[in-house]
């Protein structure tokens, strides 16, 4: 047990940094920490309550008696008290006397552990002492270039992926969940899991997006060290862990951050800025230095103490705009007369600089649903400083397109190609998330038009296109085997569907697609540059066909062809970059995936210009399908033989006897190495694209 330092000045630095907005590890100072004082075991408690007249600690240890353990004001707004006899798991709250002389009972904002809802007290907990086994993962991660690495994310909600006791709604704890999850993730080929928020929250129906405990993994699924074990086990299995993290707002629950000491403390005091009325939640005061320290410390805590590999920051757009979901008269302009939330922008820049400055190999992912510029550019260059952003525009366009009856897809072809106008403006993740399979939106499979067979064909086509499109990938649980009904957080997924051929075959397709993606650098190594992508057929809207190349850093290519129409296309011709044989390596219409088995095998390129190339191939495109074909390497020119060289030499003219002749040899031709395919980087022709 730690020996508590007695000298008050020992706390001067963390307090100073806290008040400057620069304490990135405020959790080490605030909250409850087991220690010894004068040889007596107990815990020291510290809390920030700037408007409080008095604060005391209450709990089982003093029968919840206000004033029995009063706290001392260390400095302006910060209260402290050592309580002897406190033990691990003791439940406590802060009893705060407000400026109006009312008593409010508050959970500890910095608590590491909490009671399980409906109870809401904080628990004393020591997170030290766990022996990590993920040293190999951490070492490899520190060398990893996350931008130019494969990333196929499996998004899940911890309580409803599977359940320990479905009849009674009993979930697995974190460690048990890891044991169930790891074999599935490895078999399916995902690189990361992303958990919906596990920071403590009171209301199950919020899915974790209304947080009351920014330093506590939800006790629904076990103790903090159970969650440490979850991350550790996944890392040892070679699987990354991303957490959803919510700095955009917090709920009004009376025991939480709302009006913490009887006055606005964590929330913006301006009613036109401090509340999301549509959500019924409060907005953080991003201009308050102590709130900055609180939030950045929370983010750093999960990265540093729980070894998570990235944070997906929720609802960034709501932070950036003062008029977000607000009517005229419900918001006010910033000091420059604009609608941008300048304090929130500065906070996000500071947050990302702090995390990525210390851990450049981690991921800071923005869920930003507008066209805000430079989201994934460094703060030093005027950006927000994230290194990834969800591509919500692509998601909306493609789901709208896929829901369209194929008879009318020709008129909506621009929804397939439009994303390439901006695909390389940010470091995008392509998200098919939980938000798209709830609230009457239908499951992904049920969004697809057509009969039973066509729904699966459409979905396989979409998954094939998604995996080939530039950007990292994210798929919500259940969609990879064709969950038919919407997600319900109270129930596990319908795993019994895997007893049906079509669902099992769809799952096999996604599995093979994931492994093919990971094994094919052309699909991920140059995700954020035109150098990694090349159109071949962008504008065949009449037949709803597109074709393009993906290219890795060494120039190796994969040809991708998508037919979004339920019509068989025989002898469909397209230009190709190199002569030689093109081998079909993955076909969504393969019988083993539930298709009709219309395949191409190997096709040989024929001479004849098309689509800007000197040769072309002819394919059979199955109805509703995505095809992947290997591209042969460019041929090196044949080395010239001696007699060829002699034949190529021009005859020397007869030398004039009256003139001095100087023999000159022609300059040698430039070395012809491996010929690169002609670069055709152009975007889809505007005249032929419907947007």
What does each model-identified segment do?
Residues 47, 94, 156, 185, ...:
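Conserved, mostly hydrophobic/aromatic
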Residues 307-309, 324-490, 497, 518-589, ...:
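Conserved alpha/beta catalytic core and glycan-binding cleft of carbohydrate-active enzymes
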